[in-house]
Curated annotation (Swiss-Prot):
Keyword tags: ATP-binding, Ligase, Nucleotide-binding, Protein biosynthesis
Name of protein: Aspartyl/glutamyl-tRNA(Asn/Gln) amidotransferase subunit C
GO biological process, one term: regulation of translational fidelity
Reaction catalysis annotation: L-glutamyl-tRNA(Gln) + L-glutamine + ATP + H2O = L-glutaminyl-tRNA(Gln) + L-glutamate + ADP + phosphate + H(+); L-aspartyl-tRNA(Asn) + L-glutamine + ATP + H2O = L-asparaginyl-tRNA(Asn) + L-glutamate + ADP + phosphate + 2 H(+)
Pfam families for the chain: GatC
Function, as annotated: Allows the formation of correctly charged Asn-tRNA(Asn) or Gln-tRNA(Gln) through the transamidation of misacylated Asp-tRNA(Asn) or Glu-tRNA(Gln) in organisms which lack either or both of asparaginyl-tRNA or glutaminyl-tRNA synthetases. The reaction takes place in the presence of glutamine and ATP through an activated phospho-Asp-tRNA(Asn) or phospho-Glu-tRNA(Gln).
Cystine crosslinks: none
Name of the gene: gatC
InterPro entries the UniProt entry points to: Asp/Glu-ADT_sf_sub_c, GatC
NCBIfam families on file: gatC (TIGR00135)
Lineage: Bacteria, Pseudomonadati, Pseudomonadota, Alphaproteobacteria, Hyphomicrobiales
Similarity comment text for this entry: Belongs to the GatC family.
Keyword Magnesium assigned: no
EC class (word): ligase
Organism domain of life: Bacteria
Amino acid sequence: MSVDISTVKRVAHLARIAVSEDDAERMTGELNAILGFVEQLNEVDVEGIEPMTSVTPMKMRMREDKVTDGGIAAAVVANAPVTEDNFFVVPKVVE
């Protein structure tokens, strides 16, 4: 896949970025170089290799999945002018 100057201008327009003609030409070359590197990555044989979440093998530390109220509901609503059963009470704004 390669990028031409019209594609660079179109992407810049979609991203709402002002790009001069000189910058568009320069970016065309840079984007083509990046895409060339990505195409090289597609050639690597990864058959039988497990996906990794990190470059170093490590176990994810997981906590027990249990439902709690957090124990801080009263502290959260402590500064609110009006509360009811640990919920904020606000004036009705829509009829």
